């Protein structure tokens, strides 16, 4: 049986790079101390859109263009486009259909948008891989993850405003008779923090009738102890390893949610993975939400941490709370 492998991966981020000092001053002026938070999260810099021309869609297009060029492919070579975002620039038409136009896709191309919040791109990767296994018409797929959170962040909320960054990732998946690719995946859903992040705060129906004041179309966030994510991750990953017969020491790169460095290290330790295997990019990129595990994968590939045939573990968690763990052979 053919495997579905990652043929290529590329990323895009805006040129505007912001260090911690900007946010420290911003919150100092409001009487809010964030130095401890930034240190705990492992933040140093992040990239942020600072113009009206860029958004989640344009970042996704840049990442897609980069990966197509890198692979020596054109839009017409792609059989499926999946665009993952929780801040889609458009709801109608879908961003994947717009992407189809931008890359000059073929008439046969399947176009789907995916929103599973911060697990979106990882879930899309898993779901598209399985769809490719079942549908011989799909030889190559383009999976894109891109979020632009800044326009929807409360400037008095340090977790979102100082913790997040803008970036997009794109991967080309390809059917390969000699590859393993996706090995297995597991999901876990626990709605104990169902409404801790809500956007739009009152739902789309009320937004359409009541409107919202400029600068107030923001995520409504209620802080919670995110260490609960660690236990969910550990349970999922241990189950995945047991079901797939995978030894922790065989994992060459752990590409986890980049929200919190302590959580990354804690999960790695609890599942028996050496901390050197855990990839961290949140110090440079901040938390890029849906794309963050694949920004980490890009670093692992570009630095030579992993080679073809190595096993890679993904884990991330999304609003609600839902988490996903995926293991692949790169």
Predicted regions and their residues:
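Condensing-enzyme catalytic core mediating Claisen C-C bond formation in acyl metabolism
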Residues: 1-53, 157-227, 235, 330
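Conserved beta-ketoacyl condensing-enzyme motif
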Residues: 6, 52-116, 236, 240-264, ...
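Acidic, glycine-rich active-site loops and adjacent beta-strand->loop/helix elements
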Residues: 12, 84-89, 116-119, 145-150, ...
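A glycine- and small-aliphatic-rich helix-loop capping segment at beta-alpha/alpha-beta transitions
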Residues: 23-26, 94-106, 129-134, 157-163, ...
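Acidic-glycine-rich active-site phosphate/pyrophosphate-binding loop
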Residues: 30-39, 90-104, 143-149, 204, ...
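Claisen-condensing/thiolase-fold acyl-transfer catalytic domains that form or cleave C-C bonds
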Residues: 57, 61, 87-88, 106, ...
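Flexible, glycine-rich active-site loops centered on histidine and acidic residues
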Residues: 133-167
